[in-house]
């Protein structure tokens, strides 16, 4: 069952718990690039553990059919415990500030108080990413769904924070995709490292 599979991933944070998508008859629909799901469970941190030690690479896919199988079985934020994250990033990019592709980047963030709404925005964003719907798709690293006790959030990570034109275009397109009317903000990863809450751009 999908719920059992999701539970197994949440409990063990191991790629070994995710079954390979079953082969389907006929030709598969290849994506423009490979994408990788990651899972980070911070709900039970080990004492003295460094940030990022609970981050696990879970599954890499490159077809539409694999994506839907994985999403249906496992990757819905509403199934996560508090203080856990799902990530979908381009293969080869780790969802860390330290990754060379992310180091000079930043993120657009939207918050949600409803799990169903978070699930919907997460799905719409993932479909837009794997479907290459952004004009500046090469500047996008991936998306993170974060479940927290007070308020959940979705963050779209990009590569070149200093490129205001690219980030504004991505932000406007993302708002359209997830059907959000409230203002969303963009933060540089450099500011987050220094614990600065300053937002650089907004749409």
From Swiss-Prot:
Q: Where is the composition biased (Low complexity)?
A: 1-25
Q: Which tissue types show expression of this protein? A: Expressed ubiquitously with highest levels in young leaves and roots, and lowest levels in flowers.
Region: Disordered, residue numbers: 1-27
Q: Name one GO molecular function term.
A: RNA 7-methylguanosine cap binding
What effect does gene inactivation have here?
A: (Microbial infection) No significant resistance against peanut stripe virus (PStV). Plants lacking both eIF4E and eIF(iso)4E exhibit an increased resistance against PStV.
UniProt keyword list: Cytoplasm, Disulfide bond, Host-virus interaction, Initiation factor, Nucleus, Plant defense, Protein biosynthesis, RNA-binding, Translation regulation
Which cysteines are cross-linked by disulfides?
Answer: 102-141
- What Gene Ontology cellular-component terms does the record carry? cytoplasm; eukaryotic translation initiation factor 4F complex; nucleus
Post-translational modification (record): According to the redox status, the Cys-102-Cys-141 disulfide bridge may have a role in regulating protein function by affecting its ability to bind capped mRNA.
Cite the SUPFAM superfamilies for this sequence.
eIF4e-like
Q: Which GO terms describe its biological process?
A: defense response to virus; regulation of translation
Please indicate which superkingdom the organism of origin belongs to.
Eukaryota
* Chain residues that bind mRNA: 47-52, 79, 97-98, 148-153
Q: Where is the protein found, in the record's own terms?
A: Cytoplasm; Nucleus
Q: Which family does it belong to?
A: Belongs to the eukaryotic initiation factor 4E family.
Name the job this protein performs. Answer: Component of the protein complex eIF4F, which is involved in the recognition of the mRNA cap, ATP-dependent unwinding of 5'-terminal secondary structure and recruitment of mRNA to the ribosome. Recognizes and binds the 7-methylguanosine-containing mRNA cap during an early step in the initiation of protein synthesis and facilitates ribosome binding by inducing the unwinding of the mRNAs secondary structures. Key component of recessive resistance to potyviruses such as peanut stripe virus (PStV).
Give the quaternary structure. Answer: EIF4F is a multi-subunit complex, the composition of which varies with external and internal environmental conditions. It is composed of at least EIF4A, EIF4E and EIF4G. EIF4E is also known to interact with other partners. In higher plants two isoforms of EIF4F have been identified, named isoform EIF4F and isoform EIF(iso)4F. Isoform EIF4F has subunits p220 and p26, whereas isoform EIF(iso)4F has subunits p82 and p28.
Instruction: Name the chain's protein.
Output: Eukaryotic translation initiation factor isoform 4E
